[in-house]
């Protein structure tokens, strides 16, 4: 998304002699689908996979073990913190997209990916295979909002980079749960990096 992205990549490749490939949201979804995620989900149910980053968030719908659709939106933790003027428009687009593509899908649940949801899950002391409920996520969100930036660092032990972005990240997951009518969110220890390794091994990318 960076305006100087191509220039930056060229400079890195020149200095390191390492080729860099920039992937879009659609390809990212396919790479994630190639992970062992399929072993963790129930083939009879439907899931909305949400990967929250700093500048964008990827949404992928799975149902009965198949990838139905995927879309990347330019809204992430950093963009929300910066109060980007386009945020309101993008929020509406996300709500519409999720509502349309999860309509009619029963037994819906979220699958969360990203450093912030991993931290939230760790703080919950929940067992690895168990999900977090919408009620818990909402209560945790309200709890975080009441604390100052300094309190989130000193009392919760969050690092400085995490202490500010964890609130907008939680808002994204909560909104996705609400719009998809999901009552729980799973947080597996599988993500894009796992998919890249597996895809490279099998010659997919």
Where are these regions (language model features)?
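Helical "lid/coupling" subdomains associated with nucleotide-phosphate turnover
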Residues: 1-46, 61-205
